[in-house]
């Protein structure tokens, strides 16, 4: 089949892992000769990379898909793909709901997109949701940025939080080898990328599934050692990582982050609830006291560290007193960013079957109250930036003001300042902060730090 001047469009829902998967699948499509189309209505292949963490994200997918399914009646050569977590969860049921679909593929099959599409082009309707070993990516991803990049270090999750569908749809933990991770990072350094975010659903579990143990009996490979191993990759100026689990977040890792200058002093560590009974019901494997000790240890080693987190309100059986324990934790810690959600029952999870579900009214009320407090604390934390000089990695032009560029501080705060994107993109610029807002900063450029050439 010829693919000259044929176009594709990918719409991505959900987490950073999905965004990284979409970049890899875009790379596969471009290797096959397809060109990107910003407008899905001009595309010959439309791929929805989906999220099932909450019901509203899942329903949005069906809304988008319905519009394109109607289009296919007039354009039968249109290829429709649902990838990601909804595809994995629903499998062949998706074909019954949307018979116009050509390909349903779970996240473990992202690197197999070419083979799956070739089967579709041969006239088959394909479902690929079986559990497989994730093959190393042999295709260069089409990355959305030329400055920052995602690098997967571990796929899947072995945790069994009672509210979470991720282990069901992303499979068991599969760690990449340190050499494969470093090789990808070295190539990114040669291409001029400056910042890499190492990704995993539970990144602190890295290496547990790889062979080998030390003489002391611990796993031969672990995430802390990986940070030391990749820290000196030429050309890479910054390292971030996500997402962490409090159960596995160690003082040794904290110490490494404090010692390694390229590691950004920003930590995303979900706590989900500030109440121990709820944490036990969620099967999170830690207490709020342990979570607080982790944050205290981070701030002891790195007093100015930026901390972000996730929290759930309205978990089955949550009492007002238990919810207030979550409010107290947020008040006491003071997060730099707080992602919140009302509990959403997900198919195949234990908590979805419990008979102590809360009303939507209670969940909505608690979500509003938590957001109000969280935003107040974020605004308080932002005030410390005023008048300081922060180093900002310039990523792009401010879409709302063409005279400004934008980037992020070491602590992951979005920052705007005057400048020419053609001169500054990918540069580290010292910026004096002159205006603070809860979620962003504005400043004046002071000095451009010249990166060491690769």
Curated annotation (Swiss-Prot):
Q: Identify the keywords attached in UniProt to this record, alphabetized.
A: 4Fe-4S, Cytoplasm, Iron, Iron-sulfur, Metal-binding, S-adenosyl-L-methionine, Transferase, tRNA processing
Q: Which cofactor does it need?
A: [4Fe-4S] cluster
Q: What is its main location?
A: cytoplasm
Details of cofactor binding: Binds 2 [4Fe-4S] clusters. One cluster is coordinated with 3 cysteines and an exchangeable S-adenosyl-L-methionine.
**Can you tell me which residues bind [4Fe-4S] cluster 2?**
157, 161, 164
Q: Name one GO cellular component term.
A: cytoplasm
Specify the superkingdom. Bacteria
Name all Radical SAM core domain ranges: 143-381
Please state every residue range assigned to the domain named MTTase N-terminal. Answer: 6-122
Q: In which residues is [4Fe-4S] cluster 1 bound? A: 15, 51, 85
Does the entry annotate any disulfide bonds, and if so which pairs?
none
Q: Name one GO molecular function term.
A: metal ion binding
**Domain called TRAM: residue spans:** 383-447
Annotated localization: Cytoplasm
Listed InterPro entries:
Elp3/MiaA/NifB-like_rSAM, Methylthiotransferase, Methylthiotransferase_CS, Methylthiotransferase_N, Methylthiotransferase_N_sf, MiaB_methiolase, rSAM, rSAM_horseshoe
Q: Which NCBIfam families match?
A: miaB-methiolase (TIGR01574), MiaB/RimO family radical SAM methylthiotransferase (TIGR00089)
- Which purpose does this protein serve, as stated in its record? Catalyzes the methylthiolation of N6-(dimethylallyl)adenosine (i(6)A), leading to the formation of 2-methylthio-N6-(dimethylallyl)adenosine (ms(2)i(6)A) at position 37 in tRNAs that read codons beginning with uridine.
Q: Family, per the entry?
A: Belongs to the methylthiotransferase family. MiaB subfamily.
- What protein name applies here? tRNA-2-methylthio-N(6)-dimethylallyladenosine synthase
């Amino acid at each position: 089949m010829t693919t000259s001047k044929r176009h594709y469009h990918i719409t991505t829902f959900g987490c950073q892992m999905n965004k990284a998967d979409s970049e890899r699948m875009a790379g596969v499509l471009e290797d096959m000769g397809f060109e990107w189309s910003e407008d899905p209505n001009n595309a010959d292949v439309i791929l929805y990379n989906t999220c099932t963490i909450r019901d509203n994200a899942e329903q949005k997918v069906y809304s988008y898909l319905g519009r394109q399914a109607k289009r296919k009646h007039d354009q039968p050569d249109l290829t429709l793909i649902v990838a990601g977590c909804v595809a994995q969860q629903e499998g062949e049921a998706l074909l019954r709901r949307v018979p116009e679909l050509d390909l349903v593929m779970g996240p473990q099959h992202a690197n197999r997109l070419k083979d799956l599409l070739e089967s579709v082009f041969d006239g088959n309707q394909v479902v690929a949701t079986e559990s497989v070993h994730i093959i190393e990516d042999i295709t260069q991803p089409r990355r959305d940025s030329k400055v920052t990049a995602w690098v997967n270090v571990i796929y899947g999750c072995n945790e069994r939080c009672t509210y979470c569908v991720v282990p069901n749809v992303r499979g068991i933990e599969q760690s990449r080898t340190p050499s494969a991770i470093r090789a990808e990072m070295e190539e990114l350094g040669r291409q001029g990328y400056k910042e890499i975010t190492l990704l995993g659903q539970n990144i602190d579990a890295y290496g547990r599934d790889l062979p080998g143990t030390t003489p002391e009996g611990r796993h031969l490979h672990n995430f802390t050692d990986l940070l030391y191993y990749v820290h000196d990759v030429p050309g890479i100026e910054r390292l971030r990582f996500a997402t962490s689990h409090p159960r596995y977040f160690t003082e040794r890792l904290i110490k490494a982050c404090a010692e390694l200058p390229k590691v950004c002093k920003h930590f995303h560590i979900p706590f989900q609830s500030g109440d121990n009974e709820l944490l036990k019901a969620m099967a999170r494997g830690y207490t709020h006291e342990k979570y607080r000790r982790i944050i205290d240890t981070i701030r002891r080693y790195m007093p100015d560290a930026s901390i972000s987190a996730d929290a759930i309100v309205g978990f089955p059986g949550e009492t007002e007193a238990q919810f207030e324990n979550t409010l107290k934790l947020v008040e006491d810690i003071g997060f730099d960013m707080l992602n919140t959600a009302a509990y959403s029952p997900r198919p195949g999870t234990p908590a979805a079957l419990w008979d102590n579900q809360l009303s939507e009214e209670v969940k909505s009320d608690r979500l509003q109250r938590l957001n109000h407090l969280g935003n107040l604390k974020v605004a308080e934390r932002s005030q410390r930036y005023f008048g300081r000089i922060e180093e900002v990695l310039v990523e792009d032009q401010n879409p709302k003001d063409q005279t400004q560029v934008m980037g992020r501080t070491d602590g992951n705060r979005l920052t705007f300042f005057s400048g020419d994107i053609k001169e500054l993109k990918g540069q580290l610029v010292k910026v004096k902060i002159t205006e603070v807002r809860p979620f962003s900063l504005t400043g004046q450029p002071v000095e451009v730090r010249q990166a060491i050439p690769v």
